[in-house]
């Protein structure tokens, strides 16, 4: 058993209000510079929709992630020989039109224009070419299902649903999906990089790019199934979400988590067995990948696991943080968090609690007071949102989605009964595999958790480096145009 520690995140989609605060603060922190105008390390998509970049979930087009070939894992982009043969021609990556052409406005026209009969107009100007342009797409073009009746049907998750219910999806529900790099346990981007510039940090599992080693091959861009690796056209280097590692090293949460208005994000440590990773990612049936990844995780409260972890060099503070991890409770204990597209076989480490509110609003009506006994049959009958969430989070297995939504529904019903001094059927609680204490713990963590409850982050264990907290905001990369550069 080879034990490793990994920083992970869980997002509660039931609380996301789609305000894009996380996107704005992330962009102002990391990609507010030349060459990175089109990059959003964090973006919020409205689903159903084709997302950013367009149709990023269509791996037949982009060849991202892993596939099984004769029982062995192989990159969907092909073998090493195939990638070497096409080293100077990689057609499977998004173009700027798939992201969007960034623009600004010619505000000088407004301030410097002489008196005219007609009001001057600030026309959009491309940030790439400097020419005037027509705006045809943007990173949140589909916000709140804008144009969803057109682009929504092109969503790969919708296309996998039954033909008879495709055309009705936009009348059923919508949801927000915040996305960052998944910092996968089995990252395809790391394995595909010809120059070895992509790497996964040993101490915390964060996936980063060695800017000095990057040679602009861009196989990381196409091989990432979540399309969260970008190419900086100014520096000719790959860039991606860093999980704000300078903040994590100082024991602080990521900037997207810190500024989240809905408080949907949770950060914590997970221990996993590195020897089981290949086996977990190689299961034949895609619907078994969720359970196989659960088997990779280790119980930090097990004395034997804690002892072995300490012997293998994991600091005591990290083991203690893993024992108090909020994401361990949601992923392992309560099983209400699910991985995004586990069928990509990358074993992602940003998990999601599926949203119950769209389904409840449809069935109950806003402000209604239906009981869990009434809602359970409705959850079973609502094929469209259940099927869609299953394509998104469980490789098409609807049983896990139904189980999670029923747990969330029982939690709502139980806490409503507690608040109004009413009783609730104990069999209803036991039917979802939870106890009253677990439901109360779920409520505290999901609804009223304090800052220190949501973010359990051990500081870095580098005794011989300088003060990381004091150095935040100072020089990062040494070349001009790099993130955090002083030049």
Curated annotation (Swiss-Prot):
Residues bound to [4Fe-4S] cluster 3: 181, 184, 189, 224
Binding site for [3Fe-4S] cluster: 193, 214, 220
Cofactor entry: [4Fe-4S] cluster; [3Fe-4S] cluster
Molecular-function GO terms, alphabetical: 3 iron, 4 sulfur cluster binding; 4 iron, 4 sulfur cluster binding; electron transfer activity; metal ion binding; nitrate reductase (quinone) activity
Residue numbers binding [4Fe-4S] cluster 2: 26, 241, 244, 256
Binding residues for [4Fe-4S] cluster 1: 16, 19, 22, 260
EC top class, as a word: oxidoreductase
Cofactor note: Binds 3 [4Fe-4S] clusters per subunit. Binds 1 [3Fe-4S] cluster per subunit.
Location of this chain's protein in the cell: Cell membrane
EC number: 1.7.5.1
InterPro entries: 4Fe4S_Fe-S-bd (IPR017896), Nitr_red_bet_C (IPR029263), Nitr_red_bet_C_sf (IPR038262), NO3_Rdtase_bsu (IPR006547)
Chain ranges of the 4Fe-4S ferredoxin-type domain: 7-36, 172-203, 205-234
A GO cellular component entry from the record: nitrate reductase complex
Membrane topology: Peripheral membrane protein
Function: The beta chain is an electron transfer unit containing four cysteine clusters involved in the formation of iron-sulfur centers. Electrons are transferred from the gamma chain to the molybdenum cofactor of the alpha subunit.
This protein's name: Nitrate reductase beta chain
Organism: Bacillus subtilis (strain 168)
Name of the coding gene: narH
């Amino acid at each position: 058993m080879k034990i490793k520690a990994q920083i992970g995140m869980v997002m509660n989609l039931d609380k996301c209000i789609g305000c894009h605060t996380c996107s704005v603060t992330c962009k102002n922190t990391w990609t507010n510079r030349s060459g990175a105008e089109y990059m959003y390390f964090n973006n919020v998509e409205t689903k159903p929709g084709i997302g950013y970049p367009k149709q990023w979930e269509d791996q037949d087009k982009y060849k991202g992630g892993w596939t099984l070939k004769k029982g062995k894992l192989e990159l969907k982009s092909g073998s090493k020989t195939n990638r070497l043969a096409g080293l100077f021609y990689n057609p499977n990556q998004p173009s700027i039109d798939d992201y969007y052409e960034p623009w600004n406005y010619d505000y000088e026209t407004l301030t410097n224009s002489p008196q005219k009969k007609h009001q001057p107009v600030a026309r959009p100007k491309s940030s790439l070419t400097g020419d005037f342009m027509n705006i045809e797409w943007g990173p949140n073009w589909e916000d709140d299902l804008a144009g969803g009746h057109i682009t929504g049907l092109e969503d790969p998750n919708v296309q996998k649903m039954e033909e008879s219910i495709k055309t009705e999806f936009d009348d059923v529900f919508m949801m927000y999906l915040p996305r960052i790099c998944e910092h996968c346990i089995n990252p395809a981007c790391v394995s595909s990089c010809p120059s070895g510039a992509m790497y996964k940090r040993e101490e915390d599992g964060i996936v980063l790019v060695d800017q000095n080693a990057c040679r602009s091959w861009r196989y990381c861009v196409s091989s990432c199934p979540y399309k969260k690796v970008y190419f900086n056209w100014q520096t000719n280097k790959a860039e991606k979400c860093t999980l704000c590692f300078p903040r994590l090293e100082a024991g602080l949460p990521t900037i997207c988590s810190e500024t989240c208005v809905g408080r949907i994000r949770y950060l914590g440590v997970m221990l996993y067995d590195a020897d089981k990773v290949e086996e977990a990612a190689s299961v034949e049936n895609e619907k078994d990948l969720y359970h196989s990844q659960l088997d990779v995780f280790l119980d930090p409260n097990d004395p034997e696991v804690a002892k072995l972890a300490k012997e293998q060099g994991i600091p005591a503070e990290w083991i203690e943080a893993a024992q108090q991890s909020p994401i361990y409770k949601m992923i392992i204990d309560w099983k209400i968090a699910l991985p995004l597209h586990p069928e990509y076989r990358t074993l992602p480490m940003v998990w999601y609690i599926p949203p119950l509110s769209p389904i409840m609003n449809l069935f109950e009506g806003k402000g209604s007071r239906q009981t869990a006994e009434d809602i359970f049959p409705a959850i079973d009958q609502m094929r469209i949102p259940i099927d869609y969430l299953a394509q998104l989070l469980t490789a098409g297995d609807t049983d896990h989605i139904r189980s999670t939504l029923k747990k969330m529904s029982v939690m709502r019903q139980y806490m409503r009964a507690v608040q109004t001094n009413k009783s609730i059927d104990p069999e209803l609680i036991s039917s979802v595999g939870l106890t009253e204490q677990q439901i109360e713990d779920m409520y505290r963590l999901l609804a009223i958790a304090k800052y220190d409850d949501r973010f359990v982050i051990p500081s870095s264990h580098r005794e011989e480096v300088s003060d990381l907290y004091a150095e935040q905001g100072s020089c990062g990369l040494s070349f001009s145009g790099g993130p955090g550069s002083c030049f």
